């Protein structure tokens, strides 16, 4: 059995930054550190940080006065930000800069009284945070998930209308929704640069290349990870059997027993150690040496807040 690895896969710059913010805060200030929502959607990462003293909460009211609070990589609404500001808290923002870019687009539309449409998945924390940047009652903020949603949507003024997207969506599905928006509202204005982030796009391109060669595709990522789910769905659309797994222990030998080639990738919030564990598990089932496919190089780095720019090893 051949083992192929997608390239790129795993951590993106936004996830790296968010985890570093929590790790550095723990090193500098000591436990406990409070984090609103899971800092990234990966069980292994969250459990590891929890063991080191991070406390994950959903409501600001759960945080005691004088504590350190970190916003997750998914971002928060302006209401949450204001609530935290009203408290005696030290706040660090781990929102991915590419999510912040979308927040700024929505806030700009709100200030102008223009209506905005967000393409995204209802209930996802990134969507809640992005929708929560809009506050102008003269305009309006709407959420759509599919072309069908677009055709039933009514707005106040089609001449002052813009759209944005969640950063972790399926590129293909989003393209279909954008096409519907442009047909339904010919004057709608989109972002100058695509809101779907580079890491989401690159990992979807990589899983396409992987699925062209593999019989079975394993996507390492947690069930609540939007970008990981999109990778598994894309492989399935290409006619491959695909499984979304948290770690190597999830793999059943029956999944790969008849496969000549198994492809492995990982969502943007999944650490490489989980991929290495999957490779080891597949080798127990008769797999050979893992081969990494050629792919797009990524060299983007997002800085942590200056107060947290410290070599953790020096603190420890």
Swiss-Prot record:
Its EC number is 1.17.7.4. Keywords: 4Fe-4S, Iron, Iron-sulfur, Isoprene biosynthesis, Metal-binding, Oxidoreductase. Isopentenyl diphosphate binds at residues 41, 74, 124, 225-227, 269. It catalyses: isopentenyl diphosphate + 2 oxidized [2Fe-2S]-[ferredoxin] + H2O = (2E)-4-hydroxy-3-methylbut-2-enyl diphosphate + 2 reduced [2Fe-2S]-[ferredoxin] + 2 H(+); dimethylallyl diphosphate + 2 oxidized [2Fe-2S]-[ferredoxin] + H2O = (2E)-4-hydroxy-3-methylbut-2-enyl diphosphate + 2 reduced [2Fe-2S]-[ferredoxin] + 2 H(+). Dimethylallyl diphosphate binds at residues 41, 74, 124, 225-227, 269. Belongs to the IspH family. This is 4-hydroxy-3-methylbut-2-enyl diphosphate reductase. The gene is ispH.
